Amino acid sequence: MMGQNQTSISDFLLLGLPIQPEQQNLCYALFLAMYLTTLLGNLLIIVLIRLDSHLHTPMYLFLSNLSFSDLCFSSVTIPKLLQNMQNQDPSIPYADCLTQMYFFLLFGDLESFLLVAMAYDRYVAICFPLHYTAIMSPMLCLSLVALSWVLTTFHAMLHTLLMARLCFCADNVIPHFFCDMSALLKLACSDTRVNEWVIFIMGGLIVVIPFLLILGSYARIVSSILKVPSSKGICKAFSTCGSHLSVVSLFYGTIIGLYLCPSANSSTLKETVMAMMYTVVTPMLNPFIYSLRNRDMKGALERVIXKRKNPFLL
């Protein structure tokens, strides 16, 4: 990469998590279990949506892409964290660090856009049920997914190229468990004002606006539900919306707090814990919150298991 001609260091050292040596094995087992849960949960959703024709709908198109994004998002950081905890080798080459940052931004941004698309899909389904199929046409759904991929690719590449132009002189210790963009900027010995402005401006477009759109969609959904005189339906809707919004708030809240509204006296431990929330916890919770609890997914799982009795049906 072009940044290697402008830097005097060839690798970085990831300090990882502030864990006591006697707690190392326990934490390793915990994060491994969480990572495997994320992988299996999201893979199950992708496979079920692929195999069951009843799930070939706009909502599940977005869900399958979200599951793929969550799977990749966790895989960008957690395997390296587990490797460092096991081998006690915190080094990561310069090029690998920028590559990790690129894919971290790519799949993190992709999740942000997909969450907006899913909120819009639910808004149309609940507020305009008679026009749902006309509004959420296959062409619109595919266009939303394709646009999400294009925008996130551009955004991730922009930040990576801006990072590659910076000089890193002496300090190569990253007090984090992955190559976090803000942590790298603190190590740079050249002017980072352009990077910081791009983070602030693009962050508003990629994070804040989608978050507000999601909140607006759910507000309209709740308003529409309250007009229906059904206490059972209202309780179920509030339960669903509440669980969705809790995960969405966890994802966006930690990102906004870390990158757009950083505290001057924020500790490394606090930043690491916040990062764990949206890199490890959210991707693990999404399959259970959005998919595995609902009737359609349970029905699809039963149908797929039944088909296994006759492999020619698959």
From Swiss-Prot:
Q: Which GO terms describe its cellular component?
A: plasma membrane
Do you know which InterPro entries this protein is assigned to?
Answer: GPCR_Rhodpsn, GPCR_Rhodpsn_7TM, Olfact_rcpt
How is this protein situated with respect to the membrane?
Multi-pass membrane protein
Give the Extracellular membrane side ranges: 1-25, 80-100, 159-196, 261-272
Q: Where is this chain primarily localised?
A: membrane
The cross-references to PROSITE patterns, in alphabetical order and at most eight, read: G_PROTEIN_RECEP_F1_1, G_PROTEIN_RECEP_F1_2
Q: What is this protein called?
A: Olfactory receptor 1E5
